[in-house]
From Swiss-Prot:
Entry's Gene Ontology cellular component terms: extracellular region; membrane; other organism cell membrane
Molecular functions per Gene Ontology: toxin activity
Tissues and organs where the protein is expressed, per its UniProt entry: Expressed by the venom gland.
Taxonomy of the source species: Eukaryota, Metazoa, Chordata, Craniata, Vertebrata
Pfam family, one: Toxin_cobra-type
Family: Belongs to the three-finger toxin family. Short-chain subfamily. Orphan group XV sub-subfamily.
Known role: Has low cytotoxic activity.
Note, other: Is classified as a P-type cytotoxin, since a proline residue stands at position 31 (Pro-31 in standard classification).
Main location as per UniProt: secreted
Disulfide bond keyword on record: yes
UniProt-recorded name of the protein: Cytotoxin-like basic protein
Length: 62
């Protein structure tokens, strides 16, 4: 699986074994949905008071 791991959409990395999801975190209160964090995960992170997480399982989907 290949996931973006920076705020720039053309930079990505291959996820290590066992991390089968890509995630993208955006600020909940910010009108533009600019990603503040991206990467690989084994489980989808839980949303927090400030961040909304979206997970997916195909190459470069985040």
């Amino acid at each position: 699986l290949k996931c973006h791991n920076t705020q720039l959409p053309f930079i990505y990395k291959t996820c290590p074994e066992g991390k089968n999801l890509c995630f993208k975190a955006t600020l909940k209160k910010f009108p533009l949905k600019f990603p503040v964090k991206r990467g690989c995960a084994d489980n989808c992170p839980k949303n927090s008071a400030l961040l909304k997480y979206v997970c997916c399982s195909t190459d470069k989907c985040n």
